[in-house]
Amino acid sequence: DCQSKDLTSAPPGIPADTKSLDLKYNAFTQLPSDAFQGLTALTWLSVSNNQIESLPAGLFDQLVELKQLYLQGNELKSLPTGVFDSLTKLTRLDLDNNQLQSVPHGAFDRLTNLQTIRLTSNQWDCSVCEILYLSQWIRGNSAKVKDSSGQMEDPDGV
């Protein structure tokens, strides 16, 4: 448990067999692409409520067992293409309370086990073409899209 420790980077020497990593409420503004390298057994990860502005490509590539990912309460403005592609076992993704304006086409397509995604309280820009992917994805997966209370979100809200 590394929450609320004023950390500015992921601590070194995290055991490779770690299953749960709680890094919420720290002082991260960025994460290096190798921050979670070797943590192939990780099933639960929270880097929520930091000040992370962007995610590097490849950040989650080795987290092939990850089931829950909490990124809410940061300052994410965009997501790199393919950032979630290796997370095929993911069942929950929280992206609410960021500054996202759109998501890359196909961002959630490989998340075939996803049961819950939270996208509320972002700054969605409905004038950009990229928002069409998100709108269509939400319409096709509306039962998975939840608000902050866990209730299904109205797909017409996007």
PLM regions: where:
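Conserved hydrophobic beta-strand positions in leucine-rich repeat
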Residues: 1, 19-23, 42-47, 66-71, ...
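LRR N-terminal entry segment and analogous cap-like coil->beta motifs
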Residues: 1-44
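Consensus "Asn ladder" position of solenoid repeat domains
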Residues: 5, 26, 50, 71-74, ...
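Leucine-rich repeat
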Residues: 8, 14-17, 29, 37-42, 52-53, 61-66, 76-77, 85-90, ...
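Recurring C-terminal helix/loop segment of individual leucine-rich repeat
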Residues: 9-13, 31-37, 57-61, 79-85, ...
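Repeat-solenoid scaffold signature
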Residues: 91, 95-126
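Membrane-proximal C-terminal cap and juxtamembrane stalk of leucine-rich repeat ectodomains
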Residues: 116, 121-158
